[in-house]
Amino acid sequence: MEEADRILIHSLRQAGTAVPPDVQTLRAFTTELVVEAVVRCLRVINPAVGSGLSPLLPLAMSARFRLAMSLAQACMDLGYPLELGYQNFLYPSEPDLRDLLLFLAERLPTDASEDADQPAGDSAILLRAIGSQIRDQLALPWVPPHLRTPKLQHLQGSALQKPFHASRLVVPELSSRGEPREFQASPLLLPVPTQVPQPVGRVASLLEHHALQLCQQTGRDRPGDEDWVHRTSRLPPQEDTRAQRQRLQKQLTEHLRQSWGLLGAPIQARDLGELLQAWGAGAKTGAPKGSRFTHSEKFTFHLEPQAQATQVSDVPATSRRPEQVTWAAQEQELESLREQLEGVNRSIEEVEADMKTLGVSFVQAESECRHSKLSTAEREQALRLKSRAVELLPDGTANLAKLQLVVENSAQRVIHLAGQWEKHRVPLLAEYRHLRKLQDCRELESSRRLAEIQELHQSVRAAAEEARRKEEVYKQLMSELETLPRDVSRLAYTQRILEIVGNIRKQKEEITKILSDTKELQKEINSLSGKLDRTFAVTDELVFKDAKKDDAVRKAYKYLAALHENCSQLIQTIEDTGTIMREVRDLEEQIETELGKKTLSNLEKIREDYRALRQENAGLLGRVREA
């Protein structure tokens, strides 16, 4: 057992347990060393469970009992077959400790128990855990973010990205320079924000449309590209998008190259009113007569023709001004445009408030109109009834008799219809009950089959999950096998195992030989006992016949009887001696077993722990009294 203990201690050292060099057997293990060995093994086997356990034995007795119970529960969760409690850790015995450590050593991973080149300790465990995580991530194939499952998103990560979804925008185009843009659009054309229902796609659609307009403008400015827009508009949507993208890439490169030149003449600012009209062209385009808001907008933002001519004539002069004057003019123009935009926004807010007020008034008027129509219809119905009654008043008696006759006919007709309905209702009710019963049976059968199908689906899912888990374990084991060094020599362990097996075989042969010799000896004893009994019986019979005639024969008979009695006592004494020797050997084995369990030392430890526990309780009671 010492050789087995040394192999087990070597495995514990590989798992990270700091076993002193002078400890060669499990009999020398202390309580602190037992707790540390079990915790280190649990951390290697299941880091999630072992990370919450401390390898150091606490000083307080209550904390010791809690730690021992936690270790026992963790080992039982791993599948330890024998009974386990706190006493197995605080007061360990050699056989129980050997069984427990062998159980844990068998469940140690391969790299923790056989790879002797790896360092031991917490850092080694951390490095091995990091390596296993990296191997798992490298073993998984790369998947695009939109196709990742939640597990892959957890492993590989997935940022919250929004795809670029652009929609085709329909805006009015200028067919002639002199005609305003709002009169060229269709009355049914919606505003640009309304054409894109998703808020996420509005910015993308505007960017794409702006880039397309820029590319079209650049294409118009270049000679030979005037019909490019008409050519792309006649293409299918996919080819149109592809052609626009290629055209855009070429034109943007040239546009950016030209934009980084020297600052030239500032581009003439577009009329803000025209810009707002182009933005909201779909709202009111078919009105031949402008509203008050339109007139105020034109009055506020429309430039005078003379000012426009002056601005156009001043463009060459402005281009010759210094750069600072140009920037100042641009800033001033930008400030004026901002002020105009704020005024327009305020006007829009006022108009929206008026529209909301008018909308509320319109809803109230509609509700009042509906109520008036309902009350009018009710009054008309009552008026018709009263007018009919007034018409019947001149000949009241005859009309009353006619009405009575009509009522009686109606009652008879109702009774007749009730009888007919009863005739039809009885078979229909019976058929309904029959069909309801069949429906209930079908529902029960359907529910039963549905339950069977659900159970079958669950079993299929469980089998698929189990197969997937086993496949992952197989791949992990194969990857670990590939990473293991090929030059690991197990010759010493194999040779030692073969020697142990040979010794066991020799011991078995010796035990078999001893058992066979014992059986032969038992047979010989039995045969000699039977032969002795038969010889004594014959001799007793012969001597007893002659004992009546001769005194010497009588004395010989007495001596024979005494000899037989003494031999019987001697045999009984020998048997008792053998029984006692067997009991002595059993007691010696029990003594060795009890000595191996360290009963006396455990009792002494229990007494010390009991005294420490009483001291702790006394201290706690003193604190309670003081509080």
Curated annotation (Swiss-Prot):
Keywords per UniProt: Coiled coil, Cytoplasm, Cytoskeleton, Disease variant, Endosome, Intellectual disability, Phosphoprotein, Protein transport, Transport, Ubl conjugation pathway
- Name any GO cellular component annotation: nucleoplasm
Segments of this protein annotated with the region Disordered: 218-243
Q: Ranges of Basic and acidic residues compositional bias?
A: 219-230
Q: Which GO terms describe its biological process?
A: endocytic recycling; Golgi to plasma membrane transport; intracellular copper ion homeostasis; negative regulation of canonical NF-kappaB signal transduction; positive regulation of canonical NF-kappaB signal transduction; positive regulation of ubiquitin-dependent protein catabolic process; protein transport
Q: Give a yes or no for keyword Cell division in this entry.
A: no
What disease is linked with this protein in Swiss-Prot or TrEMBL? Ritscher-Schinzel syndrome 2: A form of Ritscher-Schinzel syndrome, a developmental malformation syndrome characterized by cerebellar brain malformations, congenital heart defects, and craniofacial abnormalities. RTSC2 is an X-linked recessive form characterized by intellectual disability associated with posterior fossa defects, cardiac malformations, and minor abnormalities of the face and distal extremities.
Q: What is this protein called?
A: Coiled-coil domain-containing protein 22
